Structures are given as structure tokens and as C-alpha cells.
Amino acid sequence: MEKCTFNLPDVQASKPSIAINLTRVGVTNMKKLVEIKRKDKRPIVLISTFDVFVDLPSDRKGANLSRNFEAVDEVLEKVLSTPVYEIEQLCSDIAHNLLGRHEYANQAEVRMKSEYMIRRASPSTGIKCQEVVNIFAEASAVRGNGDRDYFDVKKLIGAEVVGMTACPCAQEIMRDKAATELANLGVERDKIIKFLEKVPMATHNQRGRGIISIKVAHDFDVSLESIIKIIERSMSSSVYEVLKRSDEKVVVETAHMNPKFVEDCVRAMADNVVKEFPNLPDNAVITIKQTNEESIHRHNAFAERVALMGELRKEISQ
């Protein structure tokens, strides 16, 4: 007796009732365990969330979404056998793989975000602790106009770091108040000046959140560790999970000796990006953001700069 076989219909390949292109079709919030190997160091293990998309032409009802999962898993297996790897390269490879699987698509996008644990030591006692940094990466792949086998790939890497800022404006008000009171007590002017130089005045503080992202072509690499350090240095002080009293003294004194507006933080990040990445091309896209969560206001303060690397170089060199 012959076995009956059935050809299952490919519903996704059928024509839609409304024939329009769709910019993005895919899956979001895909959880994956990612192990990134590093040269001469222990691997980084991340629990990551992926958003994966392709565009859809007007003559297809739907995309083959299972291919998105296949593309991600295939690249993750590749990562395990590669000596050194970067998360933006991971996204780039997934985007490239997606276009190979979705022959009807002209572009693919991959977004990844994760929490990255870094080790810290408190500034005075040296107590070891772990700090969480939010990291993210993106990649896009676009087919060439004349060659469907050529993919133009761009990738992005970035981080968000929490720190502390001290307000310069309120501090100057308190400095003037202290100088007046000391003068009324008969303290000599030169002694007042020396005192104010050594002892930082009170001001209100903010918890700052700095973000830097750098978008480059597929053949350039950007150090995530360098991005994190730049953001940390841009604020009045770093913050720590565990602090003893001597540590608290150092953190508070450091912050109040280095007061900064939200605008100062963005400009400091821009300056350090130019210094830290001299080999980046002029067409690299730099996005810098700073949000300060105010302590004496109900609102937050925000500043941002988006520019090409060449534009920043030109401005800072003037």
C-alpha cells in the first residue's frame, strides 16, 4: 500500500490582501546565553536579549520567523569555537546570516542588550565588589543594489554607566555663604581662600547615567572596556556597591572637588572619545547622552551630542 504524502502550503509565501512593504518583521525579547571568549582572560558569560528583524516585500504575506532563531543559534555555536570575539561582531554575523536565510529580504537588523558584571575595589579600603553595567550592540546588513550576494554591514557598540555628579551652581552659592561667615568671624582673607581651596563646599548631588554608542563599518573594532572607562571618568565621581566610612569620605570629597553640570559630562565624554579612539574613521557615528536624576527637583537634567567622529575631532582641535 502506497503511503500518501502531502505538500504543506507555505502560507508565508502567499500574497497578502494588502500589498505593501514592511520595514521590520521579526522577533523581540529573545533570551540567549552568550559566552564571549577573551585572549588570556576568563570568558564573559552574558544572559542577553535579542531583537531580530528583516524587511518584508509587498508580495509576501509573512516572514519565516523560525529562520531568525536558526540564525542566532548558528552564530552562537560559532562563538564557542572562536578564540576572541566581540558582541558587536556577534550581531554583525547574525545580521549577515539572516540575509542568507531570508532570500526575499533586502536588509536585516539585530539588537542585543545585556548586563555586564565588572569587578571594582572601593577607593580607600580596597573592598572588592561587583558592579553592573548595561551594555548593548546592534548591527544592520543591507544587500548591494547590483549584487544580492554582497552585504553592506554596519555595527554599533555601547554602554550605560551609573555615576555621581555634584552641582556647580549650588556649590558656588554655598562657597560665597561660607566666605561671608568666615569673614564675619574675623578670619583673614588669605586664610579664607586657602580653606575654600582645600575643603569642598556642600551642594546637591545627582545620580548620573552616561551613555556612549559608536557605530562603525564591519571592519573596525571598538573597545567596550574603553567606552565604560570614558563614561565613568566623565562624571564627578564613580559610585560603589560597598563603602566603609573612609571610602565614603573619598567619594564625597572627590565628587565635590569635581562639580559638573550635565552638559560638562557630555563634553568630557566627547573629548575622551576623540583621545581614546584615534584610529576610528571620520564617518563613525558617535552618540553621547547624559541623564542626571535630580535630588532637589522633580525633573531630571539631560544633554546629548550626536556627531560624526570627524566633526568632533575638528571642534575639539580648535
UniProtKB/Swiss-Prot annotation:
Pathway given in the UniProt record: Cofactor biosynthesis; 5,6,7,8-tetrahydromethanopterin biosynthesis
Keyword Hydrolase in record: yes
Site (May be catalytically important): 167
EC numbers on record: 3.5.4.39
The protein's required cofactors: Fe(2+)
Keyword Magnesium (UniProt): no
Assembly with partners or alone: Homodimer.
Identification of the protein by name: GTP cyclohydrolase MptA
Organism encoding this protein: Methanosarcina mazei (strain ATCC BAA-159 / DSM 3647 / Goe1 / Go1 / JCM 11833 / OCM 88)
